[in-house]
Design a protein with these regions (language model features):
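N-terminal [4Fe-4S]-dependent radical SAM core
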Residues: 1-13, 23, 55, 226-228, ...
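Canonical Radical SAM [4Fe-4S] cluster-binding loop centered on the CxxxCxxC motif
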Residues: 4-43, 56
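Conserved, mostly hydrophobic/aromatic
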Residues: 16, 20, 24, 63, ...
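Short, solvent-exposed loop/turn segments at secondary-structure junctions
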Residues: 35, 72, 100, 190-191
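Radical SAM/AdoMet-radical enzyme domain recognition
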Residues: 40-63, 71-177
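Conserved G/P- and acidic residue-centered "switch" motifs that form tight phosphate/ATP-binding loops
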Residues: 67
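Radical SAM enzyme [4Fe-4S]-AdoMet core and its adjacent flexible, acidic
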Residues: 124-127, 133-139, 143-237, 243
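Cysteine-cluster motifs in flexible loop/terminal segments that predominantly coordinate metals
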Residues: 249-250
Length: 250
């Protein structure tokens, strides 16, 4: 499959639910008007879509939500997608709250990698941002996923006057563990318009000042638009998804 620019497309994101067990300030703090279950694709329908997509050259799938793990049977869906001829990789984006509970099932199903959202290491601030006191569970999930050998990326959204100063502590996740820490610029859509994000250009300059020798990491880390850097002495890498200041289509 090719896009209008002639680029090969081999990657599809599938949102399996609009439900979420958090209420992040910049996302859906008051909840959203949920779709009736009758209007949400069944797993059988999703699998048929995947079968057709593979026929057009899609080989990699990412399972998202909402929070995908609040929908029963998520691991079984992953198992069935992985069994499709031609599928090379199935990954998932999660807030991590339920990940440790279902990790063994997901590994058995063949999950290849996981992206975990984490904006702060401060327990009180986590509850302020997400609406729930669940930071310890998220950290347990990250540790469990890393220990299992699963490839892990930690997604971070920084906000001025909220968690901007925490970038150093969060970056340390990549120092001794094989984790990609990815800083994602705040998108000014929905409730995100009320928040002030942090420029990735400014953040990169701060990292370069603190860690001389930072260089581009040209290894393939996934299918998305992130630009990665290697910090001398770090096991993992740091990535930037510059939704505001980046140019994705040049």
């Amino acid at each position: 499959m090719k896009d209008l620019q002639g680029r090969d497309i081999n990657y599809m994101r599938i949102s399996i639910t609009d439900r979420c067990n958090l209420r992040c300030k910049y996302c859906m703090p008051d909840g959203i008007e949920l779709l009736p279950m009758s209007e949400i694709l069944t797993f059988e329908e999703i699998l048929r879509v995947c079968e057709q997509a593979v026929g057009f050259g899609i080989t990699r799938f990412k399972i998202t939500g909402g929070e995908p793990l609040v929908r029963r049977g998520c691991a079984d869906l992953i198992r069935k997608i992985k069994k499709l001829s031609g599928v090379e990789q199935v990954t998932m984006t999660t807030n991590g709250i339920l990940l440790s509970r279902y990790l063994d099932e997901l590994l058995d199903a063949g999950l290849d990698a996981v992206n975990i959202s984490l904006d702060t290491l401060n327990r009180g601030r986590f509850e302020e941002i997400t609406g729930f006191d669940q930071l310890p569970e998220v950290l347990r999930s990250i540790d469990a996923a890393v220990d299992s050998g699963l490839r892990v990326k930690v997604n971070v959204v920084l906000q001025q006057d909220k968690n901007a100063e925490e970038w150093q502590k969060i970056l340390e996740f990549a120092e001794r563990r094989s984790i990609d820490v990815r800083f994602i610029e705040m998108m000014p859509i929905g409730r995100g318009r009320e928040c002030t994000g942090v420029s990735n250009d400014e953040l990169l300059k701060k990292i370069q000042e603190q860690h001389p020798g930072v260089c581009k990491d040209d290894r393939v880390h996934g299918n998305g638009p992130a630009v990665y850097y290697h910090i001398p002495g770090f096991v993992g890498s740091v990535g930037f998804i510059s939704a505001i200041h980046g140019v994705f289509c040049s």
